[in-house]
Amino acid sequence: MESGDLPALDLRNIWKVFGPGDGSRAIELVKNGMSRSDILQQTQQTVAVRDVSFSVARGETFVVMGLSGSGKSTLIRCLSRLIEPTQGEVSLSGDNLLAMNEEQLREVRRGRMSMVFQHFGLFPHRKVIDNIAYGLEVQKIDKQARIAKATEMLKTVGLDGWADHYPQQLSGGMQQRVGLARALAVDPQILLFDEPFSALDPLIRKEMQDELIRLQKTMQRTVVFITHDFAEALRLGDRIAIMKDGSFDQVGTPEEIVSSPATPYVREFVNDVPRAKVLSVKTVTVAGTAATSSRTVMSTAKIETIIPMLLEGDEVITVTDATNKAIGIVNRQSVAKILQAEQK
């Protein structure tokens, strides 16, 4: 298989056990059906990540959503080897991350992979421009080139004019933009985000989400994003993994998860989601033709976009595919069925 055909990131059967020993006994007990609490009591070991496998395509945003203690932050640290997995495999475009020595791993972190944490980690004694250029400085890029790149990234994240300020002169949202610019400056293949926006005020948080969405449209990085906020996961993710007790309950697109929650646990999150904002028109499309309707809508449009049309008097709207070919219709009844299900 050509390297371009390989996933940007591939994890297979990742386990992480904290505590004395090599963790093999705890893993065996998990496979035999013992609960995490009983394993902790019997072995003094905590099973934080349990047999997790997933791959991320180039340019995809993969969101891992879970509550506190679900293992999501441990997982992303295993992915980057900030924490060593107990068992499993991690590959970057086919390269075995777990087989790399310290120097090889440093090279990966310097250029192929960047991480953005909840706490910004900016150097208080360095100006904004020097914070952004730090990764390039570590790579021994000459000063003129790294300042030019840092200036470009500063403009990219909307902070043009703030180069000579210090971190303490910036708001929390601005500091996180600096952290994002620093991560982007080394031109990484993979960006890892560990709840980067959770400490920000709601309005600033939404701005940062919008910023990441905008950057992804133009830069197309491979992103793994950790969050405890289901709404944030729905906004950002091409695919979402719902994590509970160290393992994935369900993996799918936002639409797949909202329309078909796989477990009662996932359903608890889905129940409060306004379906019309997440589900596409194709989920309410039925067979038929609209003889009198002049209105059409793409099957990929969100349901909320057609509700005003139906309220204005259109009883039937033609649904088209990407080639503008009619594939069916949507009517008030099919939309009402979805909205009624939301109220149950």
What are these regions (language model features)?
Residues 126-133:
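Short coil-to-helix segment of the ABC ATPase nucleotide-binding domain corresponding to the Q-loop/switch region
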Residues 88-96:
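Conserved ABC transporter NBD signature motif
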